[in-house]
Amino acid sequence: MARFTLHDLAATVDARAASGGESSYTKKLLDKGPEHCAKKFGEEAVEMVIAAVENDRGHLISETADVLFHMLVLLKSRGVKLEEVEAALAQRTSMSGLEEKASRKRD
């Protein structure tokens, strides 16, 4: 079985976002706007946390897959590419975690 990556999933999200199909769950989410996508992402994140707290490995894996999907949909809704997130991660990993945290802008 070929390895399925986040890039594969991002490409699927992109393709479904561009489709005119009413049967696409991805398209329906995006059509409802970024706020809806953010809310759905939050719901899935909470479900993932609950699965982790309950120590339910199978459920945690399933909910994590949902979180990753909804994260990519949310990013798409705001025009952010996975590669931009990867660049931010690469920049952060070039220094220690404490240095990186100290370098962040404060609100």
Curated annotation (Swiss-Prot):
One of its GO terms (cellular component) is cytoplasm. GO terms for molecular function: ATP binding; phosphoribosyl-ATP diphosphatase activity. Keywords: Amino-acid biosynthesis, ATP-binding, Cytoplasm, Histidine biosynthesis, Hydrolase, Nucleotide-binding. One of its GO terms (biological process) is L-histidine biosynthetic process. It holds the Pfam family PRA-PH. It is found in: Cytoplasm. Pathway: Amino-acid biosynthesis; L-histidine biosynthesis; L-histidine from 5-phospho-alpha-D-ribose 1-diphosphate: step 2/9. InterPro entries: HisE (IPR008179), PRib-ATP_PPHydrolase-like (IPR021130). It is an enzyme of class 3 (hydrolase). It catalyses: 1-(5-phospho-beta-D-ribosyl)-ATP + H2O = 1-(5-phospho-beta-D-ribosyl)-5'-AMP + diphosphate + H(+). Its EC number is 3.6.1.31. Belongs to the PRA-PH family. PANTHER family: HISTIDINE BIOSYNTHESIS BIFUNCTIONAL PROTEIN, HISTIDINE BIOSYNTHESIS BIFUNCTIONAL PROTEIN HIS7. This is Phosphoribosyl-ATP pyrophosphatase 1.
